[in-house]
Each structure stands twice: as C-alpha cells, then as structure tokens.
Amino acid sequence: MSESPDLSQIAPTLKAEILAEALPYIRQYHGKTVVIKYGGNAMTEERLKQGFARDVILLKLVGINPVIVHGGGPQIDQALKKIGKQGTFIQGMRVTDEETMEVVEWVLGGEVQQDIVTLINHFGGHAVGLTGKDGGLIHARKLLMPDRDNPGQYIDIGQVGEVEAINPAVVKALQDDAFIPVISPIGFGEDGLSYNINADLVAGKLAVVLNAEKLVMMTNIPGVMDKEGTLLTDLSAREIDALFADGTISGGMLPKISSALDAAKSGVRSVHIIDGRIEHSVLLEILTEQPFGTMIRSH
C-alpha cells in the first residue's frame, strides 16, 4: 500500500479544492450523529491510530457528532495467549467462557478503550470511555448460536450476548456536552453477568437508536469482495442474501454485514464498509465525493 501524500507538498490551489469539496458534506452532516465501528489495523498501527484520532476530532470541530464503538480482537487474542488460552470462534463469534470474559473486560474496557481516549485527548479532542454497563447503556441477553448442522439446535458459546435494549441517555448527555463517546461492546444481563457482544452488532444497533445519519464500519479489506477478489461497491439486501447463501460472505464478515444491513433497513440513511488500512479513510468516506468501500442498501 502506498504512503499517503505529504500535505505540505500539495499545491495551495489543490488544498483549496479539497476543502471546498468537503463543504456540502459538512452541511449535510452538521449536527448529525455518525457512528463509527473502529477496528482492525487502524487500531494497531501507530500512523493509522493517530490519523483516526485526528479525523474524529475534525468531524467534531465542524459540527458532526462522532460516536465510536471499538473492537479489539487481536489485543484479546494476545492477552489470552499470555495466559495460555487459545481463542475459538464459531460463525465469526468468539467462544467466551468465564475466564475469557474476564480478559475481554480488562482488555476492551481498560487497555484498548483508554488507548483510544488518550490519543484523541492528546490531539486536542475531548473523549470519554464507556462500556455498555455504564449508565445502563447496553442491556444484553445470552446469545444462542443456531447449529447449522442440526436445524432447531443451538450452540452455547458462553458469555456471548446480543443486544436486548440500548438506553442512549448517557451517550446523548456526553454529546450535548461536546464529548466524543468511545464505547466498549460489553453489555450486562438480568442474570448479573457481563456479556461480550460483537462490536459490529453494537455499532449497528446504536446507530439505529441514536437516529444516526451514517454508520461507518472499518475493516482490513477494501470492502465486501466477490469470490474473485473484486470490490463490490454497492450492495442491495437481495444481493447480500445471495452472497450469504453462496458462502461469499463468511466468518467475521457475517456479523458485520448482517449488522450493516439491519441498520440500513431500520432507517440509518447511509451505511458503508470501508478499508481502515488507508490513512484518513473516515474523512475520505464522510467528507469527499470519492467512492470508497461498499455501500449497503436496504432495497
């Protein structure tokens, strides 16, 4: 992948054109909420981490309200490895026993979240970290995974949850006070247990509840790819169903695309899957005309 251009080497007239191109998008999204699922290489490479932090701050400064939901799979895997555990996945979901849940809470709600918050604040933003347990944000219930080999049967994958309800009051309060919420996808159940929830699913549900104008999901590939490796730039619900059926969409992309499609069907006006390995990909998607990643449509 080529390095991003040095802005100091760009001609002043071109810089002006870039800024002018952003104006209609700033107007369109001014005062609106944009939910960003932050994950993949963008969370682990220092250059990309810093670029993301600056992007989010810029969005806030021009009147757009970013809400970040982060993952942390590689960091969880690394922490599990240190205690001699191997991560196991079924249909893109992490099997989470009690010991793994303790690691997930520590890594997501501590190390990863605070790294994001610290970096945003370092560059002049005002970020606040939350888990879904804070302020009663995410009510969860145990997820029972359908067994594809045995119709009607379910697989118990431990303390893995699905979103039962979202109470957005704490997020809205932070937005009203000009803070940037950074949310770890950990919910609480009526049984008193903590639940590990797929970050893509949380981002999609949160976008709907917050009446977000846009949902952006960052990943480590250019977008949704066909079996030949060609980027699919625009997908309807019918096309997505076909890609599920023939196995083109599989593994970790299953919950991501399902969540994106559900959000589009539930009223989120613009839903995109983008390549987080590209520096400033969030700004490119939101504030320019450049086609980027895969757009998910409800029809």
Swiss-Prot record:
GO biological process, one term: L-arginine biosynthetic process
EC number(s) given by UniProt: 2.7.2.8
Keywords for the protein's UniProt record, in alphabetical order: Amino-acid biosynthesis, Arginine biosynthesis, ATP-binding, Cytoplasm, Kinase, Nucleotide-binding, Transferase
Catalytic activity of the protein: N-acetyl-L-glutamate + ATP = N-acetyl-L-glutamyl 5-phosphate + ADP
InterPro entries: AceGlu_kinase-like_sf (IPR036393), AcgluKinase_fam (IPR004662), ArgB (IPR037528), Asp/Glu/Uridylate_kinase (IPR001048), NAGK-C (IPR041727)
Enzyme's top EC category: transferase
An annotated GO cellular component: cytoplasm
GO molecular-function terms, A-Z: acetylglutamate kinase activity; ATP binding
Pathway(s) per entry: Amino-acid biosynthesis; L-arginine biosynthesis; N(2)-acetyl-L-ornithine from L-glutamate: step 2/4
Superkingdom as given in the UniProt entry: Bacteria
Record-listed substrate binding positions: G72, G73, R94, N196
Compartment list: Cytoplasm
Residue stretches spanning the membrane: none
Site (Transition state stabilizer): K37, K256
Function statement: Catalyzes the ATP-dependent phosphorylation of N-acetyl-L-glutamate.
Family in the record: Belongs to the acetylglutamate kinase family. ArgB subfamily.
NCBIfam families, alphabetized: argB (TIGR00761)
Protein name from the UniProt record: Acetylglutamate kinase
